[in-house]
Amino acid sequence: MNDKVAATLVLVVTYSIVGASLWCLTYAWHDETKLYYWCIVQLLPVMLWVWCVISWCGAQLFGYAKRGKAD
């Protein structure tokens, strides 16, 4: 998969998540009990993205770590 296809795929997935979140908000706008589900729908992709970035940074740090001699 080349870079252009990967970037387009990420963009389409991101906009579909935003569109689904906005549709869910308009569906739950008049019922206050459903707004809790809106918060979950809105925050779950953000937390998954943060978790992925932190995991990737940790993997990069671990991969480039220099191994010292055992004392």
Swiss-Prot record:
GO terms for cellular component: endoplasmic reticulum membrane. It comes from the Eukaryota. Pfam families: PIG-Y. Its main location: endoplasmic reticulum. Interacts with GPI2, suggesting that it is a component of the GPI-GnT complex, probably composed of GPI1, GPI2, GPI3, GPI15, and ERI1. The chain crosses the membrane at residues 5-25, 35-55. GO terms for biological process: GPI anchor biosynthetic process. It is a multi-pass membrane protein. Keywords: Endoplasmic reticulum, GPI-anchor biosynthesis, Membrane, Transmembrane, Transmembrane helix. Coiled coil: none annotated. Pathway: Glycolipid biosynthesis; glycosylphosphatidylinositol-anchor biosynthesis. Probable component of the GPI-GlcNAc transferase (GPI-GnT) complex in the endoplasmic reticulum, a complex that catalyzes transfer of GlcNAc from UDP-GlcNAc to an acceptor phosphatidylinositol, the first step in the production of GPI-anchors for cell surface proteins. This is Phosphatidylinositol N-acetylglucosaminyltransferase ERI1 subunit. It comes from Eremothecium gossypii (strain ATCC 10895 / CBS 109.51 / FGSC 9923 / NRRL Y-1056) (Yeast). It is found in: Endoplasmic reticulum membrane.
